[in-house]
From Swiss-Prot:
Lineage: Bacteria, Pseudomonadati, Pseudomonadota, Gammaproteobacteria, Enterobacterales
InterPro entries in the record: 4pyrrol_synth_GluRdtase, 4pyrrol_synth_GluRdtase_dimer, 4pyrrol_synth_GluRdtase_N, GluRdtase_CS, GluRdtase_dimer_dom_sf, GluRdtase_N_sf, NAD(P)-bd_dom_sf, Shikm_DH/Glu-tRNA_Rdtase
Domain-related comment: Possesses an unusual extended V-shaped dimeric structure with each monomer consisting of three distinct domains arranged along a curved 'spinal' alpha-helix. The N-terminal catalytic domain specifically recognizes the glutamate moiety of the substrate. The second domain is the NADPH-binding domain, and the third C-terminal domain is responsible for dimerization.
One GO MF term attached to the UniProt entry: glutamyl-tRNA reductase activity
Subunit structure, as described in the record: Homodimer.
Name of the protein: Glutamyl-tRNA reductase
Protein backbone atom coordinates (compact mmCIF):
# COMPACT_ATOMS: atom_id res chain seq x y z
CA UNK A 1 0.00 0.00 0.00
CA UNK A 2 1.10 3.55 -0.70
CA UNK A 3 -0.15 7.07 0.04
CA UNK A 4 -0.63 9.53 -2.82
CA UNK A 5 -1.51 13.19 -3.25
CA UNK A 6 -2.52 14.40 -6.71
CA UNK A 7 -3.87 17.83 -7.60
CA UNK A 8 -3.69 21.33 -9.01
CA UNK A 9 -3.63 24.63 -7.15
CA UNK A 10 -3.23 28.38 -7.52
CA UNK A 11 0.50 27.96 -8.13
CA UNK A 12 0.17 25.51 -11.01
CA UNK A 13 -3.08 26.49 -12.76
CA UNK A 14 -5.05 29.68 -13.53
CA UNK A 15 -8.60 30.08 -12.30
CA UNK A 16 -9.90 29.26 -15.80
CA UNK A 17 -8.59 25.69 -15.37
CA UNK A 18 -9.17 25.35 -11.63
CA UNK A 19 -12.86 26.10 -12.01
CA UNK A 20 -13.17 23.18 -14.45
CA UNK A 21 -11.64 20.72 -11.98
CA UNK A 22 -13.68 21.59 -8.89
CA UNK A 23 -15.95 19.06 -7.20
CA UNK A 24 -19.38 20.40 -6.29
CA UNK A 25 -20.43 19.73 -2.66
CA UNK A 26 -23.74 18.40 -4.00
CA UNK A 27 -22.04 15.67 -6.04
CA UNK A 28 -18.98 14.96 -3.89
CA UNK A 29 -20.44 11.70 -2.57
CA UNK A 30 -20.84 10.37 -6.10
CA UNK A 31 -17.33 11.51 -7.00
CA UNK A 32 -15.86 9.60 -4.06
CA UNK A 33 -17.89 6.52 -4.95
CA UNK A 34 -16.64 6.71 -8.54
CA UNK A 35 -13.04 7.22 -7.40
CA UNK A 36 -13.14 4.15 -5.16
CA UNK A 37 -14.21 2.01 -8.10
CA UNK A 38 -10.77 2.49 -9.65
CA UNK A 39 -8.85 -0.81 -9.39
CA UNK A 40 -5.89 0.49 -7.40
CA UNK A 41 -7.72 2.92 -5.09
CA UNK A 42 -8.47 1.55 -1.63
CA UNK A 43 -9.44 4.79 0.11
CA UNK A 44 -9.62 8.48 -0.70
CA UNK A 45 -10.32 12.05 0.38
CA UNK A 46 -11.26 14.78 -2.11
CA UNK A 47 -10.30 18.35 -1.18
CA UNK A 48 -11.85 20.99 -3.44
CA UNK A 49 -11.59 24.73 -2.69
CA UNK A 50 -11.35 27.89 -4.77
CA UNK A 51 -7.56 27.57 -4.83
CA UNK A 52 -6.98 23.84 -5.09
CA UNK A 53 -8.42 20.47 -6.04
CA UNK A 54 -6.54 17.53 -4.53
CA UNK A 55 -7.00 13.80 -4.15
CA UNK A 56 -5.44 12.05 -1.16
CA UNK A 57 -5.40 8.31 -1.75
CA UNK A 58 -4.37 5.01 -0.25
CA UNK A 59 -3.51 2.80 -3.22
CA UNK A 60 -2.03 -0.48 -4.34
CA UNK A 61 1.12 0.02 -6.38
CA UNK A 62 0.92 -0.78 -10.09
CA UNK A 63 2.79 0.31 -13.20
CA UNK A 64 -0.07 2.37 -14.66
CA UNK A 65 -1.17 3.91 -11.36
CA UNK A 66 -0.53 7.55 -12.24
CA UNK A 67 -2.16 7.28 -15.66
CA UNK A 68 -5.17 5.54 -14.14
CA UNK A 69 -5.83 8.32 -11.61
CA UNK A 70 -5.22 11.13 -14.11
CA UNK A 71 -7.54 9.45 -16.63
CA UNK A 72 -10.26 9.20 -13.98
CA UNK A 73 -9.90 12.88 -13.04
CA UNK A 74 -10.04 13.97 -16.69
CA UNK A 75 -12.96 11.69 -17.49
CA UNK A 76 -14.94 12.91 -14.49
CA UNK A 77 -14.48 16.56 -15.46
CA UNK A 78 -14.64 15.99 -19.23
CA UNK A 79 -11.10 17.19 -19.83
CA UNK A 80 -8.25 15.80 -21.88
CA UNK A 81 -4.99 14.77 -20.17
CA UNK A 82 -3.19 17.35 -22.29
CA UNK A 83 -5.27 20.15 -20.76
CA UNK A 84 -4.19 19.35 -17.20
CA UNK A 85 -0.88 17.49 -17.46
CA UNK A 86 1.33 20.57 -17.10
CA UNK A 87 -0.62 21.77 -14.06
CA UNK A 88 -0.83 18.52 -12.09
CA UNK A 89 1.50 17.62 -9.24
CA UNK A 90 1.99 14.15 -7.83
CA UNK A 91 3.38 13.26 -4.39
CA UNK A 92 3.91 9.79 -2.96
CA UNK A 93 4.37 8.48 0.60
CA UNK A 94 6.73 10.83 2.49
CA UNK A 95 6.11 13.71 0.04
CA UNK A 96 2.34 13.13 0.15
CA UNK A 97 2.33 13.20 3.95
CA UNK A 98 4.43 16.36 4.05
CA UNK A 99 2.23 18.03 1.42
CA UNK A 100 -1.00 17.39 3.33
CA UNK A 101 0.50 18.65 6.58
CA UNK A 102 1.75 21.80 4.82
CA UNK A 103 -1.65 22.36 3.20
CA UNK A 104 -3.59 21.97 6.46
CA UNK A 105 -1.14 24.26 8.28
CA UNK A 106 -1.62 27.01 5.70
CA UNK A 107 1.95 26.74 4.39
CA UNK A 108 0.84 26.02 0.82
CA UNK A 109 -2.01 28.55 0.70
CA UNK A 110 -2.29 31.61 -1.51
CA UNK A 111 -2.37 33.47 1.80
CA UNK A 112 0.45 32.05 3.89
CA UNK A 113 -0.90 30.74 7.17
CA UNK A 114 -4.58 31.39 6.42
CA UNK A 115 -6.75 29.41 8.85
CA UNK A 116 -9.72 28.60 6.61
CA UNK A 117 -7.94 25.75 4.83
CA UNK A 118 -7.83 23.61 7.99
CA UNK A 119 -11.61 23.72 8.24
CA UNK A 120 -11.87 22.80 4.56
CA UNK A 121 -9.51 19.83 5.04
CA UNK A 122 -11.56 18.68 8.04
CA UNK A 123 -14.75 18.97 6.01
CA UNK A 124 -13.25 16.88 3.18
CA UNK A 125 -12.14 14.27 5.71
CA UNK A 126 -15.61 14.16 7.29
CA UNK A 127 -17.20 13.63 3.88
CA UNK A 128 -15.00 10.59 3.27
CA UNK A 129 -15.85 9.33 6.75
CA UNK A 130 -19.56 9.53 5.91
CA UNK A 131 -18.95 7.67 2.67
CA UNK A 132 -16.85 5.03 4.50
CA UNK A 133 -14.03 5.85 2.10
CA UNK A 134 -11.16 5.80 4.61
CA UNK A 135 -8.50 3.19 5.33
CA UNK A 136 -6.64 2.90 8.64
CA UNK A 137 -3.51 4.56 7.27
CA UNK A 138 -5.39 7.43 5.59
CA UNK A 139 -7.52 8.07 8.67
CA UNK A 140 -4.44 8.07 10.89
CA UNK A 141 -2.71 10.48 8.49
CA UNK A 142 -5.54 13.02 8.62
CA UNK A 143 -5.90 12.81 12.40
CA UNK A 144 -2.16 13.34 12.72
CA UNK A 145 -2.36 16.25 10.27
CA UNK A 146 -5.01 18.00 12.36
CA UNK A 147 -2.79 17.81 15.44
CA UNK A 148 0.18 19.11 13.41
CA UNK A 149 -1.83 22.10 12.17
CA UNK A 150 -2.89 22.84 15.74
CA UNK A 151 0.73 22.65 16.89
CA UNK A 152 1.79 25.06 14.14
CA UNK A 153 -0.88 27.55 15.25
CA UNK A 154 0.10 27.20 18.91
CA UNK A 155 3.89 27.28 18.59
CA UNK A 156 4.33 29.86 15.81
CA UNK A 157 2.88 33.26 14.93
CA UNK A 158 1.90 32.24 11.43
CA UNK A 159 -1.74 33.13 11.99
CA UNK A 160 -1.42 36.30 14.04
CA UNK A 161 -1.89 38.87 11.26
CA UNK A 162 -5.27 39.29 9.58
CA UNK A 163 -4.37 38.10 6.10
CA UNK A 164 -6.84 36.15 3.96
CA UNK A 165 -8.60 36.26 0.62
CA UNK A 166 -11.50 37.92 2.43
CA UNK A 167 -9.18 40.48 4.01
CA UNK A 168 -7.50 41.08 0.65
CA UNK A 169 -10.88 41.79 -0.95
CA UNK A 170 -11.61 44.38 1.72
CA UNK A 171 -8.12 45.86 1.37
CA UNK A 172 -8.73 46.26 -2.36
CA UNK A 173 -12.00 48.08 -1.68
CA UNK A 174 -10.28 50.44 0.76
CA UNK A 175 -7.54 51.16 -1.79
CA UNK A 176 -10.06 52.15 -4.47
CA UNK A 177 -12.48 54.09 -2.26
CA UNK A 178 -11.24 56.61 0.30
CA UNK A 179 -13.91 55.62 2.78
CA UNK A 180 -16.20 52.59 2.89
CA UNK A 181 -18.57 53.88 5.55
CA UNK A 182 -21.12 55.51 3.22
CA UNK A 183 -20.92 52.98 0.39
CA UNK A 184 -23.46 50.31 -0.46
CA UNK A 185 -22.03 46.79 -0.54
CA UNK A 186 -23.65 43.71 -2.05
CA UNK A 187 -22.34 40.37 -0.80
CA UNK A 188 -23.35 37.32 -2.83
CA UNK A 189 -23.25 34.06 -0.87
CA UNK A 190 -23.19 33.37 2.86
CA UNK A 191 -20.36 30.87 3.24
CA UNK A 192 -17.24 31.15 5.36
CA UNK A 193 -15.44 33.56 3.01
CA UNK A 194 -18.39 35.94 2.76
CA UNK A 195 -18.79 35.76 6.54
CA UNK A 196 -15.20 36.94 6.91
CA UNK A 197 -15.72 39.70 4.33
CA UNK A 198 -18.87 40.89 6.10
CA UNK A 199 -17.08 41.04 9.46
CA UNK A 200 -14.12 42.92 7.97
CA UNK A 201 -16.47 45.47 6.37
CA UNK A 202 -18.47 45.80 9.57
CA UNK A 203 -15.25 46.54 11.47
CA UNK A 204 -14.59 49.36 8.96
CA UNK A 205 -17.98 50.95 9.73
CA UNK A 206 -19.71 49.97 6.48
CA UNK A 207 -23.32 50.83 7.25
CA UNK A 208 -25.15 49.58 4.18
CA UNK A 209 -24.75 45.91 3.26
CA UNK A 210 -27.00 43.56 1.33
CA UNK A 211 -26.53 39.79 1.44
CA UNK A 212 -27.96 37.73 -1.43
CA UNK A 213 -28.03 34.00 -0.86
CA UNK A 214 -29.84 30.89 -2.06
CA UNK A 215 -31.12 30.07 1.45
CA UNK A 216 -32.42 32.94 3.55
CA UNK A 217 -31.79 31.25 6.91
CA UNK A 218 -27.99 31.19 6.62
CA UNK A 219 -27.87 34.72 5.22
CA UNK A 220 -30.19 36.04 7.94
CA UNK A 221 -27.91 34.81 10.72
CA UNK A 222 -24.96 36.68 9.19
CA UNK A 223 -27.10 39.75 8.43
CA UNK A 224 -28.23 39.96 12.06
CA UNK A 225 -24.58 39.91 13.15
CA UNK A 226 -23.43 42.74 10.87
CA UNK A 227 -26.65 44.72 10.43
CA UNK A 228 -27.22 43.84 6.78
CA UNK A 229 -30.29 43.42 4.58
CA UNK A 230 -31.07 39.98 3.13
CA UNK A 231 -32.30 39.70 -0.45
CA UNK A 232 -33.06 36.67 -2.65
CA UNK A 233 -30.62 35.78 -5.42
CA UNK A 234 -33.41 36.50 -7.88
CA UNK A 235 -33.44 40.16 -6.77
CA UNK A 236 -29.78 40.82 -7.62
CA UNK A 237 -30.68 42.17 -11.07
CA UNK A 238 -33.11 44.68 -9.58
CA UNK A 239 -30.83 45.75 -6.71
CA UNK A 240 -27.43 45.69 -8.42
CA UNK A 241 -27.60 49.38 -9.32
CA UNK A 242 -27.66 50.21 -5.59
CA UNK A 243 -24.27 48.58 -5.04
CA UNK A 244 -20.98 50.47 -5.15
CA UNK A 245 -19.10 47.28 -4.28
CA UNK A 246 -20.03 43.69 -5.14
CA UNK A 247 -18.14 40.79 -3.55
CA UNK A 248 -19.25 37.31 -4.57
CA UNK A 249 -18.33 33.83 -3.35
CA UNK A 250 -20.82 31.02 -3.94
CA UNK A 251 -20.59 27.38 -4.99
CA UNK A 252 -22.69 27.96 -8.10
CA UNK A 253 -21.46 26.01 -11.15
CA UNK A 254 -22.56 28.88 -13.45
CA UNK A 255 -22.10 32.68 -13.28
CA UNK A 256 -24.71 34.52 -11.24
CA UNK A 257 -23.93 38.03 -12.48
CA UNK A 258 -23.67 38.53 -16.24
CA UNK A 259 -22.40 41.31 -18.45
CA UNK A 260 -25.90 42.45 -19.42
CA UNK A 261 -26.97 42.66 -15.78
CA UNK A 262 -24.01 44.90 -14.94
CA UNK A 263 -24.58 47.04 -18.06
CA UNK A 264 -28.14 47.76 -16.93
CA UNK A 265 -26.95 48.57 -13.41
CA UNK A 266 -24.27 50.98 -14.66
CA UNK A 267 -26.80 52.75 -16.84
CA UNK A 268 -29.13 53.17 -13.86
CA UNK A 269 -26.17 54.47 -11.82
CA UNK A 270 -25.43 57.06 -14.53
CA UNK A 271 -22.06 55.32 -14.96
CA UNK A 272 -20.89 55.85 -11.40
CA UNK A 273 -18.07 53.29 -10.94
CA UNK A 274 -18.70 49.87 -9.51
CA UNK A 275 -16.10 47.54 -7.95
CA UNK A 276 -16.78 43.82 -8.43
CA UNK A 277 -14.62 41.23 -6.65
CA UNK A 278 -15.22 37.61 -7.67
CA UNK A 279 -13.56 35.21 -5.23
CA UNK A 280 -15.52 32.16 -6.32
CA UNK A 281 -14.26 29.16 -8.28
CA UNK A 282 -16.03 28.50 -10.63
CA UNK A 283 -16.48 32.23 -11.21
CA UNK A 284 -19.72 33.93 -10.13
CA UNK A 285 -19.27 36.96 -12.42
CA UNK A 286 -18.81 36.67 -16.17
CA UNK A 287 -15.24 37.76 -17.01
CA UNK A 288 -16.60 39.94 -19.86
CA UNK A 289 -17.91 42.32 -17.18
CA UNK A 290 -14.32 43.55 -16.92
CA UNK A 291 -14.62 44.98 -20.44
CA UNK A 292 -17.28 47.48 -19.36
CA UNK A 293 -16.35 51.09 -18.69
CA UNK A 294 -16.71 52.00 -15.00
CA UNK A 295 -16.91 48.32 -13.98
CA UNK A 296 -13.74 47.26 -12.16
CA UNK A 297 -13.68 43.46 -11.96
CA UNK A 298 -11.11 41.52 -9.95
CA UNK A 299 -10.86 37.73 -9.68
CA UNK A 300 -9.29 35.64 -6.93
CA UNK A 301 -6.06 35.59 -8.92
CA UNK A 302 -5.97 39.40 -9.01
CA UNK A 303 -5.87 39.48 -5.22
CA UNK A 304 -2.46 37.79 -5.23
CA UNK A 305 -0.45 41.05 -5.36
CA UNK A 306 -2.35 42.52 -2.42
CA UNK A 307 -1.87 39.38 -0.42
CA UNK A 308 1.87 39.31 -1.10
CA UNK A 309 2.20 42.75 0.44
CA UNK A 310 1.03 41.39 3.79
CA UNK A 311 3.23 38.30 3.77
CA UNK A 312 6.60 39.43 5.09
CA UNK A 313 5.72 39.11 8.77
CA UNK A 314 4.65 35.52 8.30
CA UNK A 315 7.82 34.33 6.59
CA UNK A 316 9.81 33.87 9.78
CA UNK A 317 6.94 31.97 11.39
CA UNK A 318 6.71 29.81 8.27
CA UNK A 319 10.30 28.64 8.77
CA UNK A 320 9.40 27.44 12.26
CA UNK A 321 6.27 25.79 10.92
CA UNK A 322 8.23 23.95 8.24
CA UNK A 323 10.49 22.45 10.92
CA UNK A 324 7.43 21.21 12.80
CA UNK A 325 5.99 19.66 9.64
CA UNK A 326 9.28 17.91 8.82
CA UNK A 327 9.51 16.51 12.33
CA UNK A 328 5.92 15.30 12.43
CA UNK A 329 6.15 13.89 8.90
CA UNK A 330 9.15 11.80 9.97
CA UNK A 331 7.24 10.59 13.03
CA UNK A 332 4.26 9.55 10.93
CA UNK A 333 6.39 7.75 8.35
CA UNK A 334 8.14 5.85 11.16
CA UNK A 335 4.72 4.76 12.43
CA UNK A 336 3.64 3.81 8.92
CA UNK A 337 6.75 1.70 8.33
CA UNK A 338 6.26 0.02 11.69
CA UNK A 339 2.81 -1.14 10.57
CA UNK A 340 4.54 -3.31 7.99
CA UNK A 341 6.10 -5.33 10.84
CA UNK A 342 2.84 -5.87 12.73
CA UNK A 343 1.96 -9.17 11.05
CA UNK A 344 5.52 -10.48 11.42
CA UNK A 345 5.59 -9.57 15.11
CA UNK A 346 2.22 -11.25 15.60
CA UNK A 347 3.48 -14.46 13.95
CA UNK A 348 6.70 -14.38 15.98
CA UNK A 349 4.81 -13.98 19.24
CA UNK A 350 2.40 -16.78 18.31
CA UNK A 351 5.34 -19.08 17.52
CA UNK A 352 7.03 -18.26 20.84
CA UNK A 353 3.76 -18.80 22.69
CA UNK A 354 3.31 -22.19 21.02
CA UNK A 355 6.80 -23.30 22.08
CA UNK A 356 6.22 -22.05 25.60
CA UNK A 357 2.92 -23.96 25.79
CA UNK A 358 4.58 -27.15 24.51
CA UNK A 359 7.38 -26.90 27.08
CA UNK A 360 4.89 -26.14 29.84
CA UNK A 361 2.74 -29.12 28.87
CA UNK A 362 5.77 -31.42 28.94
CA UNK A 363 6.80 -30.07 32.36
CA UNK A 364 3.33 -30.56 33.84
CA UNK A 365 3.21 -34.11 32.48
CA UNK A 366 6.59 -34.86 34.08
CA UNK A 367 5.40 -33.48 37.41
CA UNK A 368 2.29 -35.64 37.18
CA UNK A 369 4.52 -38.67 36.70
CA UNK A 370 6.37 -37.90 39.93
CA UNK A 371 9.56 -36.40 38.51
CA UNK A 372 11.22 -34.07 41.01
CA UNK A 373 10.24 -30.44 40.56
CA UNK A 374 13.84 -29.20 40.45
CA UNK A 375 14.66 -31.60 37.60
CA UNK A 376 11.49 -30.60 35.75
CA UNK A 377 12.36 -26.89 36.03
CA UNK A 378 15.91 -27.47 34.82
CA UNK A 379 14.69 -29.52 31.85
CA UNK A 380 11.99 -26.92 31.07
CA UNK A 381 14.52 -24.07 31.04
CA UNK A 382 16.97 -26.07 28.91
CA UNK A 383 14.40 -27.17 26.31
CA UNK A 384 12.70 -23.78 26.11
CA UNK A 385 16.07 -22.06 25.62
CA UNK A 386 17.04 -24.48 22.84
CA UNK A 387 13.71 -24.11 21.06
CA UNK A 388 13.74 -20.31 21.22
CA UNK A 389 17.33 -19.92 19.97
CA UNK A 390 17.15 -22.64 17.29
CA UNK A 391 16.04 -20.40 14.38
CA UNK A 392 18.29 -17.43 15.28
CA UNK A 393 21.25 -19.82 15.67
CA UNK A 394 20.71 -21.22 12.17
CA UNK A 395 20.50 -17.70 10.73
CA UNK A 396 23.74 -16.72 12.48
CA UNK A 397 25.51 -19.83 11.15
CA UNK A 398 24.29 -19.15 7.59
CA UNK A 399 25.38 -15.51 7.71
CA UNK A 400 28.80 -16.42 9.07
CA UNK A 401 29.22 -19.29 6.62
CA UNK A 402 28.44 -17.09 3.61
CA UNK A 403 30.65 -14.27 4.83
CA UNK A 404 27.71 -11.87 4.95
CA UNK A 405 29.07 -9.46 7.57
CA UNK A 406 26.21 -6.99 7.12
CA UNK A 407 23.55 -9.62 7.77
CA UNK A 408 25.55 -11.00 10.69
CA UNK A 409 25.71 -7.55 12.28
CA UNK A 410 21.99 -7.01 11.65
CA UNK A 411 21.24 -10.30 13.43
CA UNK A 412 23.50 -9.32 16.33
CA UNK A 413 21.65 -6.00 16.61
CA UNK A 414 18.22 -7.65 16.49
CA UNK A 415 19.26 -10.14 19.20
CA UNK A 416 20.67 -7.37 21.37
CA UNK A 417 24.12 -8.95 21.51
CA UNK A 418 25.94 -5.62 21.35
CA UNK A 419 23.83 -3.99 24.06
CA UNK A 420 24.97 -6.09 27.01
Amino acid sequence: MSLLALGINHKTAPVSLRERVTFSPDTLDRAIESLLRQPSVQAGVVLSTCNRTELYLSVEQRADLRQQIVDWLCSYHQLTPEEVSDSLYWHQDNEAVSHLMRVASGLDSLVLGEPQILGQVKKAFSESQREQALSADLERLFQKTFSVAKRVRTETEIGTSAVSVAFAACTLARQIFESLARLNVLLVGAGETIELVARHLHQHQVQHMMIANRTRERAQSLADEVGAEVIPLADIDARLADADIVISSTASPLPIIGKGMVERALKARRNRPMLLVDIAVPRDIEPEVGDLANAYLYSVDDLHAIIQGNMAQRQEAAVQAEHIVQQECANFMAWLRAQGAVDTIREYRAQAEQRRAEAESEALAALAQGVEAEAVIRRLAHRLTNRLIHAPTKSLQQAAGSGDAQRLQMLRDSLGLDHN
